[in-house]
């Protein structure tokens, strides 16, 4: 039986009144509602009909059905709304994004500062050891020396001076920020650079290296001195020794100690050249990687980790190649720089030929030029590359860690998708 459809519905005869046609006053029971003006046209498309209130569960019911109540046992949970699905996928993608970024950054920080430090210790000890007959150019010799040091002095001997290297990095970053604020020299170069900006940026870097020079010298001493003779230095000894070097206070040094003015030029030269080479190589590697990689479409939340890998790993590879090229090209200058810094400090280092015993450092260089000529005359051209095998070991470990990190996160992508 079909329900009888009314012949006419004008909102409970609302339009039949004179007020509905805009001709009279509103009835008393509607005086509290705002007045609305309606045209007197009889077009049904202009009729105003109020909708019933939205009663939960009252939609799509058949004859005799009851409206289900909220929280009832018989109510079935419907599928999530479209916005809810997007928000859930966005939240999971955000978590994967943070996890990927944190993990990749932590792996890079661990590799560059912790895992590479034993190689830096061995490299510096070989560079300043002018007594050495074995130049340690092979990575296998470096591994053998590491084993001998560990057997005689323990694992601590391979990570000595690591705290002072962090202090030097902190001083460098702090000095760069303060100088940039007061001198308005650019800390970074944008894409639309000009020669004036490059000059100001390199000037800022040079001023930072001038400030860091005494603390770098103190950190170098902590890195190369033997654990057999000296006690383990404190965390702030680097700051104390650096300030003592500036103010001519603290432990008396030898007369062969070079003044800071003599050490400043090679330190600034090495720092600026290292920065220029590494920045140039990094930009070139990133350019070629992005040029060869295909354009990427916007991905869903399941591919956020893969996208993060594609964003981060080209930068890590570029940083790896930049540091490698800069260290290899400037290795001879670094050898000269370290010998100038260590001269006259009465430092006793480990014997890198045997892996045990100690040897003193008693050089008499007069400056940068004299040091270069003396090394060339007494040790030959390969004397500038003493300890180069440590560079091979360092960057081999770095490459292995990068590859392992990439494999781990690729497996995470496959399991999450």
Swiss-Prot record:
Residues 1-13 have a biased composition (Basic and acidic residues). One of its GO terms (cellular component) is mitochondrial outer membrane. The chain crosses the membrane at residues 102-122, 162-182, 198-218, 257-277, 313-333, 382-402. Keywords: Membrane, Mitochondrion, Mitochondrion outer membrane, Repeat, Transmembrane, Transmembrane helix, Transport. Residues 31-41 have a biased composition (Low complexity). Belongs to the mitochondrial carrier (TC 2.A.29) family. PANTHER family: MITOCHONDRIAL OUTER MEMBRANE PROTEIN SLC25A46, TB1 PROTEIN-RELATED. This is Solute carrier family 25 member 46-A. The gene is slc25a46-a.
């Amino acid at each position: 039986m079909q329900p009888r459809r009314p012949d006419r519905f004008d909102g409970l005869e609302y339009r039949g009144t004179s007020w509905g046609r805009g001709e009279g006053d509103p009835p008393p029971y509607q005086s509290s509602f705002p007045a609305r003006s309606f045209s007197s046209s009889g077009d049904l498309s202009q009729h105003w009909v109020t909708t019933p209130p939205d009663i939960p569960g009252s939609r799509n019911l058949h004859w005799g059905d009851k409206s289900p109540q909220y929280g009832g046992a018989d109510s079935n949970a419907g599928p999530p709304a479209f916005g809810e699905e997007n928000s859930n996928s966005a939240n999971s993608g955000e978590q994967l994004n943070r996890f990927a970024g944190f993990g990749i950054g932590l792996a890079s920080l661990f590799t560059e500062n912790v895992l590479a430090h034993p190689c830096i210790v061995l490299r510096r000890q070989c560079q300043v050891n002018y007594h050495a007959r074995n130049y340690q150019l092979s990575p296998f010799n470096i591994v053998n020396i590491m084993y001998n040091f560990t057997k005689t002095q323990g694992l601590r001997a391979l990570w000595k001076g690591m705290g002072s290297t962090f202090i030097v990095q902190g001083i460098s970053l702090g000095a760069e920020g303060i100088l940039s604020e007061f001198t308005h020299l650019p800390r970074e170069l944008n894409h639309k650079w000009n020669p004036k900006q490059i000059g100001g940026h390199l000037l800022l870097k040079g001023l930072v290296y001038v400030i860091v020079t005494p603390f770098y010298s103190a950190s170098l001493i902590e890195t190369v001195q033997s654990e057999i003779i000296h006690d383990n230095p404190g965390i702030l000894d680097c700051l104390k020794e650096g300030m003592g070097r500036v103010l001519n206070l603290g432990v008396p040094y030898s007369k062969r100690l070079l003044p800071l003015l003599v050490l400043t030029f090679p330190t600034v030269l090495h720092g600026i050249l290292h920065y220029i080479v590494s920045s140039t190589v990094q930009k070139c590697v990133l350019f070629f990687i992005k040029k060869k990689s295909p354009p990427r479409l916007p991905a869903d939340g399941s591919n956020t980790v893969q996208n993060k890998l594609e964003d981060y790993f080209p930068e890590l590879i570029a940083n790896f190649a930049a540091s490698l090229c800069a260290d290899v090209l400037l290795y001879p200058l670094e050898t000269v720089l370290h010998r100038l810094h260590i001269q006259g400090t009465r430092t006793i280092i480990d014997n890198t030929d045997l892996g045990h015993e100690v040897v003193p450092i008693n050089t008499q260089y007069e400056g940068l030029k004299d040091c270069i000529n003396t090394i060339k005359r007494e040790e030959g051209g390969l004397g500038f590359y003493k300890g180069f095998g440590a560079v091979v070991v360092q960057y081999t470990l770095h490459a292995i860690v990068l590859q392992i990190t990439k494999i781990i996160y690729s497996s995470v992508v496959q399991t999450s998708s």
